[in-house]
């Protein structure tokens, strides 16, 4: 039996069991905080073409997946490239949410690899879950990318003065963006490029986060510019909504009236 990337039966079984076991554990322990790992969206990069079963591209892909799935996931992100400049080049990048590390990040990565079957045998594809995104491409990713951004929002509108709410929420997100790119916001010797807090907006508590993909950004200015750009899209995405987010492969933000992160 073959999945979209023709992974071996053994690898598919290992990934599936890892996803099921970890997700059951997470659901049981964090459901009260609305901490889920729901599938959000995917995009097949059709222009990059397809690969054939048994090809060198497939072998490179499977080798990458094996190496990543057996890593520690300590930093919550990874970027692996092989055969640069050749038709068989495989590039995998994943970023887990700022509160998802180690086993939680591994589980999300495994779910992402399994989810790539939505793009059968495509060399390129991106999939987003609540706690991570996984991108597989046949090209090297070396710059900020806005082409794959998309919006999500709560269909319910805020009660009261929506204009005032929008202003406060955008200011809060802008403040988090500054915190995410502070020089002293370090983690494991690298800039965290992530910030999350809560704040009273009117009579309700608002929870929010911002994050940049750590491996893409060599300089904090790139992260800052990315966050500024997507926060400026707030009026299109989230005008007067009780919750919303802009996601992509370079940076993202989210806000809700309920806790969605681990403390």
Swiss-Prot record:
The gene is CRRSP31. This is Putative cysteine-rich repeat secretory protein 31. Its main location: secreted. It is found in: Secreted. Gene3D superfamilies: Gnk2 domain, C-X8-C-X2-C motif. Residues 1-32 form the signal peptide. Belongs to the cysteine-rich repeat secretory protein family. The keyword Secreted applies. It comes from Arabidopsis thaliana (Mouse-ear cress). One of its GO terms (cellular component) is extracellular region.
């Amino acid at each position: 039996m073959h999945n979209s990337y023709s992974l071996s039966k053994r690898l598919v079984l290992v990934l599936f069991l890892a996803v099921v076991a970890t997700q059951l554990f997470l659901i049981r322990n964090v459901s009260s905080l609305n901490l889920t790992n729901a599938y959000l969206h995917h995009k097949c990069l059709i222009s990059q073409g397809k690969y054939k079963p048994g090809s060198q591209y497939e072998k490179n892909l499977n080798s990458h997946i094996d190496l990543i799935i057996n890593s520690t996931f300590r930093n919550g992100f990874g970027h692996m490239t092989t055969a640069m400049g050749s038709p068989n080049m495989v590039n995998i990048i994943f970023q887990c949410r700022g509160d998802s590390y180690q086993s939680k990040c591994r589980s999300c990565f495994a779910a992402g690899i399994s989810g790539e079957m939505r793009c059968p045998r495509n060399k390129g594809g991106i999939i987003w879950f609540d706690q991570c995104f996984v991108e597989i491409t046949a090209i090297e990713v070396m710059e900020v990318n806005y082409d794959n951004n998309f919006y999500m929002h709560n269909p319910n509108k805020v009660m009261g003065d929506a204009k005032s709410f929008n202003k406060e929420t955008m200011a809060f997100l802008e403040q988090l963006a500054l915190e995410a790119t502070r020089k002293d916001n370090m983690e494991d010797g690298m800039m965290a490029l992530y910030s999350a807090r809560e704040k009273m907006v009117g009579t309700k508590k608002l929870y929010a986060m911002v994050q940049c993909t750590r491996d893409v950004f060599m300089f904090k200015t790139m992260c800052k510019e990315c966050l500024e750009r997507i926060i400026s899209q707030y009026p299109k995405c989230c005008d007067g909504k009780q919750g919303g987010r802009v996601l992509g492969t370079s940076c993202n933000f989210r806000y809700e009236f309920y806790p969605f992160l681990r403390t």
